[in-house]
Amino acid sequence: MKKLMEQMAEELSAAFEKAGYDPSYGKVTVSNRPDLCEFQCNGAMAGAKAYKKAPFMIADDVVAYLKDSQVFSMAEVVKPGFINLKVKGEFLADYLKAMAADEKLSVSAAKEPKTIIIDYGGPNVAKPLHVGHLRSAIIGESIKRIGRFVGHKVIGDVHLGDWGLQMGLIITELKHRKPELVYFDDSYTGEYPEEAPFTISELEEIYPCASGKSKEDEAYRNEALEATHLLQQGKPGYMALWNHIMNVSVTDLKRNYDKLNVSFDLWKKESDAQPYIPGMVEDMKEKGFAYVDQGALVVDVKEENDTKEIPPCMLLKSDGASLYTTTDLATIVERMKLFNPDEILYVVDKRQELHFIQVFRCARKTGLVKDDTKLSFLGFGTMNGKDGKPFKTREGGVMRLETLIKDINEEMFTKIVENRSVKDKDAKETAEIVGLSAIKYGDLSNQATKDYIFDIDRFTSFEGNTGPYILYTIVRIKSILNRFVEEGGNLEAGAILDPVNDSQKNLMLQLTGFGATVENAFEEKAPHKICAYIYDVSNAFNSFYHETKILSEENEAQKASFIQLLKLTKKVLETCIDLLGFSAPDRM
């Protein structure tokens, strides 16, 4: 269906054309003076130079053709030549009826659906998720959901770090602690045990211990480097240990991502790309892209228009070892082979920008991707504490994601119990649902590229621009609809009618923005635009609620109209929070 703004622009364009002017001047925008009008057209200002005519004279000519408009209840000229507009209530009601009947609530399906891979999450195995992993998971998940909603085939890949020195460190520390394990017996030829020789908690303790030792003890570090090398060469005992590490770690990662309502289509790993490296490197050498510089194999990626130096992209170190750049390039080769995507989007810390500039340029220069394959980088800012520094525990350490979720849930549980709005037995589950909204909305309501302050007190508040406030609004609507049914009302009866007051019209106008907001949020990879939109819708609904007697309305047709408007508001808000990656409880 056509958006409200498109229909208004068509009406204005026709009026410009009838008045003898170019119809392209008929663009309509939301008014920057809502006290005077709802929308405005500045086309007469733009046309003044072309027609050598005062803008208010052009505007007068155009408005003369809007007197019998089926769209506008008001079209008036304000000097020096703005056209101020108000929409007819009947036209607005008809638009919302069509929107309610539309499966996608006015979102236009992508004309050319694309296959898009989103690389987000990106944790290293054998390490617990911490708050630094939060943004990639939350932002990537939301963009994936929005992309699917507008009609694209979007594939989410967690892309695990599983092939670096951390594996060698864990194997070395295990060998020091439990040398009797069969994995370290070179003469062993039997089947390796199915059960891992460690738990997730032991694994998470082993890595930092080994990492600390490697910084103090060079011999220990060399042993870990050798273990990494032997693993990558396919040593059977080490491969069996690697499988145990992967199984134990991935099971725990999935459990934690489930708590965040984040899911991945692919659980690909750095190691999956390793088989592609030799052929890729050889091809780059044969075609003359790769050359040896100070012992390392590199590809030049600088361009004439660069305003800062972009160093060569390193493929292999002087000892022949591969790097993150090598693995990322080989992963692109794998993705092109398996999925042939139109776009690959990486949702990672903005401090990795140089790395991805090098990788993208190298991939294009060497022909790893098609000319029209889009390689995108969404670099997010840092989540900071109230002191403006990266978020830490009270002791100054890196906070585990599990701990953050637990702290938020406890805060929400306390507030919900104080409100006494939910039975004790349901309070814990409700706190988890609302707690997730506090975390996700708190993050996503900020522009992804910017740093922000993670303020638990503010994010868990039921007032202001917060997740709990949005959920409270949805629960309020659910409560009214439930009462309506309990009183014998039929949720399917009636239709949205003209607004009876300004607050209702404002709510109706806000709802019309859904389609454009969602499409724009995907186009700009900007979930914060959906947050801003649902905050406006929630405020508009709550104003309408306080100013209007909904269930006590005596005119049955009018009451039914209110109910249909509430149903649409609920559907819009619930669709939006699903796109952001959380849901609403039945009570709060």
Set out the residue ranges of the language-model regions.
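Non-catalytic interaction-recognition regions
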Residues: M1-A93, K111-M588
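Short, cationic low-complexity segments
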Residues: D102-K114
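Short, charged, solvent-exposed linker or helix-capping segments at domain edges/interfaces
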Residues: D94-M99
